C-alpha cells in the first residue's frame, strides 16, 4: 500500500482494502483497543466521530453529499490500526524501505520524462511529472529528501561514511527535482519549515544554527541557479498583489485569499456546531449569491484544513485537529532517527494544511496517516521492546 501511494490512487485504495481485511483476520486486531486508549489513537477517531455526527445537522440537503464528505475523514481510522500493527510487527522498516524504493523509481522516471520528453505518455500533466500531479509528487519527494538527510546523519554518526554519502546524494537528487523540475509552492514552504525543524531538533543549538545557515546558503544558491524556482515564487507575489474581491482573476493565490476571507465569514455564522458535514459547497454558494468576479466563485475546498473542518463541524472540530497534531508530535518526542522522521511527517502536514486541505487530499492525507501509523508503531515497539506483552507477539 505504501509503495503504491506515490503512483496510483486506484492501486493504493485497492491495497488498502486488502490490508483492512487482512488486519481484521490477523492477531494484530486484538491490539487496536489498546491504541484507542491513547491520545494519538483516540483523537483521530474522535475527529471522525464528530464529523459523523455533523451529518445530522448539515445544511447540505442531499444525504449522498453528506456521506461523501464523511469519506474524507474515514482514513483517520487507519492511524490506530497501523500503530497497533507495527507496534508488534517487525516489518515497519521494510514498509519504509519499500516506500523509498518506490519513490526512487518515480524520481528516475521523472528525470527521464523531463530530459527525454518523448517518453512522456498521454496522461502526464507535464514533463517531469509522469503520474499524478506536481503538487503530490513534490510533497512526496520533499519528505523523502529530508528523511534521507536524517538517515545520512545517523549513518555518519555510526561511522558508515559510504552509506551516509550515498544517502546524501540521493537526498539531493530528490531536492534537485523539486527545485529545478517540478514543484508546488507549498512544497517550498515545507522545505524551509523542515530545514528549521530538523536543524533545531536533531542537533544542539550551536549545530542547529549552523544547519540553518548552511541551509539558507543552499537555498540562496538554488534561487540564483534555478529560473524555474524564481518564476514560481515571483508569480506567487504577483498573484497576491493582484487580489481584489471585485476584480476577476485566475491567479491561484488571489483565489485562495478570497476563499479564506469567505471561510471566516461562514465560520462566524455557526462557530460552535458548524454547518454540518458536507456543507462547504452549499455555504459558498450562499455567499456567492448575487455576487460577481472573485466573490462569485464556489468551491468544495477552501484550501485550508482548519477552515475546511470548522465550516463543517465548528471550532471544536478544528481544536480536535490541532490536538491530534500535538499528540502525534508528542508521540515522536524522542531524539532517535525514526522519531525525527515521524515528526517531519506531522510538521509537513501542519504546514501543508495552512495552504491546502491536505488531510482531505488522497496522497497527502494518506501520506500522513501511513507515516504516523507505521513510524509511530516502530517508535513504540522500540520503547516497549523489553515488555512481556511483546515477547510472545507475532512478528
Specify the residue positions occupied by each region the protein language model found.
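Interfacial transmembrane-helix termini
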Residues: 2-19, 32-38, 49-76, 85-94, ...
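Membrane-embedded alpha-helical segments of multi-pass membrane proteins
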Residues: 10-27, 69-80, 136-145, 188-196, ...
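Transmembrane alpha-helices of multi-pass inner-membrane enzymes
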Residues: 18-23, 191, 195, 324, ...
Amino acid at each position: 500500500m505504501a509503495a503504491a501511494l506515490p503512483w496510483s490512487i486506484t492501486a493504493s485504495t485497492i491495497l488498502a482494502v486488502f490490508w483492512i481485511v487482512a488486519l481484521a483476520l490477523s492477531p494484530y486486531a486484538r491490539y487496536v483497543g489498546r491504541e484507542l486508549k491513547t491520545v494519538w489513537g483516540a483523537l483521530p477517531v474522535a475527529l471522525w466521530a464528530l464529523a459523523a455526527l455533523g451529518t445530522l445537522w448539515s445544511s447540505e440537503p442531499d444525504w449522498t453529499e453528506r456521506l461523501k464528505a464523511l469519506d474524507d475523514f474515514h482514513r483517520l481510522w487507519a492511524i490506530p490500526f497501523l500503530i497497533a500493527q507495527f507496534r508488534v510487527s517487525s516489518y515497519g522498516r521494510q514498509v519504509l524501505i519499500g516506500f523509498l524504493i518506490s519513490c526512487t523509481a518515480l524520481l528516475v522516471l521523472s528525470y527521464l520524462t523531463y530530459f527525454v520528453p518523448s517518453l512522456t505518455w498521454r496522461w502526464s500533466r507535464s514533463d517531469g511529472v509522469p503520474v499524478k500531479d506536481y503538487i503530490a509528487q513534490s510533497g512526496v519527494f520533499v519528505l523523502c529528501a529530508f528523511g534521507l538527510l536524517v538517515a545520512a546523519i545517523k549513518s555518519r554518526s555510526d561511522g558508515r561514511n559510504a552509506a551516509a554519502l550515498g544517502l546524501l546524494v540521493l537526498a539531493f537528487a530528490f531536492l534537485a527535482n523539486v527545485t529545478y523540475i517540478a514543484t508546488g509552492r507549498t512544497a517550498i514552504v515545507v522545505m524551509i519549515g523542515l530545514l528549521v525543524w530538523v536543524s533545531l531538533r536533531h542537533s544542539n543549538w550551536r549545530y542547529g544554527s549552523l544547519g540553518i545557515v548552511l541551509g539558507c546558503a543552499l537555498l540562496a544558491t538554488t534561487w540564483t541557479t534555478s529560473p524555474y524556482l524564481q518564476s514560481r515564487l515571483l508569480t506567487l507575489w504577483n498573484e497576491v498583489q493582484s487580489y481584489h474581491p471585485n476584480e476577476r482573476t485566475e491567479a491561484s493565490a488571489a483565489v485562495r485569499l478570497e476563499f479564506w476571507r469567505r471561510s471566516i465569514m461562514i465560520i462566524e455564522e455557526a462557530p460552535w456546531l458548524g454547518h454540518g458535514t458536507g456543507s462547504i459547497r452549499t455555504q459558498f454558494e450562499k455567499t456567492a449569491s448575487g455576487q460577481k468576479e472573485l466573490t462569485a466563485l464556489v468551491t468544495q475546498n477552501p484550501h485550508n484544513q482548519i477552515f475546511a473542518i470548522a465550516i463543517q463541524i465548528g471550532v471544536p472540530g478544528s481544536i480536535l485537529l490541532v490536538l491530534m497534531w500535538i499528540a502525534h508530535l508528542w508521540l515522536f518526542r524522542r531524539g532517535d532517527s525514526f522519531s525525527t522522521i515521524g515528526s517531519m511527517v506531522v510538521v509537513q502536514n501542519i504546514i501543508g494544511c495552512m495552504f491546502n486541505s491536505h488531510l482531505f487530499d488522497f496522497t497527502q492525507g494518506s501520506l500522513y496517516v501511513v507515516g504516523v501509523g507505521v513510524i509511530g508503531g516502530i517508535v513504540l515497539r522500540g520503547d516497549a521492546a523489553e515488555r512481556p506483552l511483546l515477547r510472545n507477539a507475532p512478528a
